[in-house]
Design a protein with these regions (language model features):
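Extracytoplasmic "Venus flytrap"/periplasmic binding protein-like
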Residues: 24, 29, 46, 50-122, ...
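Extracytoplasmic/periplasmic substrate-recognition and gating elements
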Residues: 25, 49, 54, 79, ...
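Conserved C-terminal helix/tail region of periplasmic/extracytoplasmic solute-binding proteins
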Residues: 25-27, 78, 155, 361-399
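A structural signal for short loop-to-beta-strand junctions that line the ligand-binding cleft
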Residues: 75-76, 83-84, 113-152, 181-182, ...
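Hinge/lid segment of periplasmic solute-binding proteins
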Residues: 91-145, 169, 195-197, 282-286, ...
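Mature extracytoplasmic/periplasmic domains
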Residues: 102-111, 269-273, 301-378, 398
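Extracytoplasmic/periplasmic solute-binding protein
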Residues: 130-139, 145, 169-218, 261
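Glycine-centered hinge/linker elements that transmit conformational signals in sensory
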Residues: 172-175, 214-245
């Protein structure tokens, strides 16, 4: 059966990139990533299964934490022992590696398969292109703009599910009085910054956000709406439990899944945790993009392929890149991950109600919101995140 699946799968791949597999035979690939939660492991296994169904071996190197995984990749490259592929975010995180000539160009497979014709939205091409060549594979679109809601908690308390951050602030005291934690948070810097971004986009809208993150417009910072955003963000502290510091994001999601907490503000990767727990969208949990104007932020993940002294590795890397953008694999992976596929010709019939919301929005160019990582260096992003974290945790930090 496995041999048959391998043959059928190979037929779905472009002809120009099935020949390398046949000529090279069995291919072994080590992949570094940071997908370690239950939902994330279910998703990465879709890539691994597709690779192994082609008759190859997938060596899984999962490292907890994006910073740790990226650091390991860079150290391995510098040390002369690079992995076959490694995960990064849709961002400028890997630009230095491209400029230093450390990454394999994927232009050969990108041109042969017409990536520029099907990758959507086109902004993703901009992320991966350098001097007219592809150096990464975008595998999904993740949006940070979500509130995840335990429906049963809201029904028991007798308050409506909020549509905006302010509406949540209005009902949170009653949730607290009923003995539930209103807002589940993992008190890590990146989670705090993500929550601030959701509060800001809900309060300010994307045009104002672009003035802040892209243009560094001083007037946008001095605007009264930005001050309101800061006050609202800090006000959420009243509804977060004392166990938040250091909590992992998926542990915070579990609090909502289990009915200990009412809401989590987190990216759509949280959907994978609900799915693994057997929960159904709009039945057991709800998903809300807070704000009167709905945006879907353009985040997500890419894989890069470090250069290797062994010339055979390039063939393996091009095969893997091709596999990752295959429409069937894209459907399986993103349905498990909670993310949106990076092409529109994917079968989304299995999409749940929350995924469908994202699919509807991503087709509207005016609803797509670029993230800070797209415009700023990792150094700027880290400094910004640290300031936001200090502001949330230090009551003496004035607006």
């Amino acid at each position: 059966m496995k041999k048959l699946i391998s043959i059928l799968f190979s037929l779905m791949l472009p002809l120009s990139f099935t020949s390398a597999s046949k000529a090279g035979g069995h291919m072994e690939a080590e992949v570094i990533h940071w997908w370690t939660s239950g939902g994330e492991q279910a998703a990465i296994s879709k890539f691994a299964e597709a690779w192994e169904d082609m008759g190859n071996t997938w060596i899984d190197t999962a490292i907890t934490g994006g910073d740790n995984a990226r650091g390991t990749t860079v150290n391995r490259i510098i040390g002369g022992n690079p992995p076959t592929a490694a995960q990064f975010n849709i961002s400028k995180q890997f630009v230095d590696l491209v400029e230093q000539g450390q990454l394999q160009s994927l232009e050969e497979v990108a041109s042969a398969e017409g990536w520029r014709d099907f990758i959507y939205p086109p902004d993703l091409i901009e992320t991966c292109e350098y001097n007219g060549e592809f150096y990464c594979v975008p595998v999904n679109i993740h949006s940070s703009q979500w509130m995840w809601v335990n429906i049963d908690v809201f029904e028991k308390v007798g308050v409506p599910i909020p549509n905006t951050i302010q509406e949540f602030v209005d009902v949170a005291p009653k949730i607290q009085e009923a003995g539930y934690i209103p807002l589940a948070l993992g008190g890590q810097t990146w989670q705090e910054s993500l929550m601030f971004g959701v509060v800001a986009s809900s309060t300010l809208g994307f045009p104002h956000m672009a003035k802040l993150y892209r243009d560094k417009d001083v007037d946008a910072f001095r605007d009264g709406k930005f001050e309101l955003t800061l006050h609202t963000y800090r006000d959420l502290n009243r509804f977060i439990d004392e166990g938040a510091p250091g909590r992992l994001w998926n542990d915070a999601t579990a609090m909502v899944v289990e009915g200990k907490a009412a809401v989590q503000i987190m990216g759509d990767w949280a959907r994978g945790e609900f799915a693994v727990a057997g929960k159904e969208a709009k039945v057991d949990y709800d998903c809300v993009i807070p704000g009167n104007v709905k945006y879907v932020s353009l985040g997500g993940d890419v894989f890069v392929f470090p250069k290797n002294s062994d010339p055979k590795v390039k063939d393996i890397q091009l095969q893997m890149a091709s596999m990752m953008v295959n429409p069937t694999v894209q459907a399986d992976f993103n349905n498990a991950k909670g993310s949106l596929p990076m092409r529109l010709d994917v079968d989304t019939s299995a999409a749940d109600a929350c995924m469908q919301m994202g699919l509807d929005l991503i087709k509207q160019p005016e609803a797509i919101m670029r993230e800070s990582d797209d415009w700023n260096s990792p150094a700027f992003t880290n400094a910004w995140d640290d300031i936001i974290s200090e502001f949330r945790n230090d009551p003496n930090y004035s607006v």
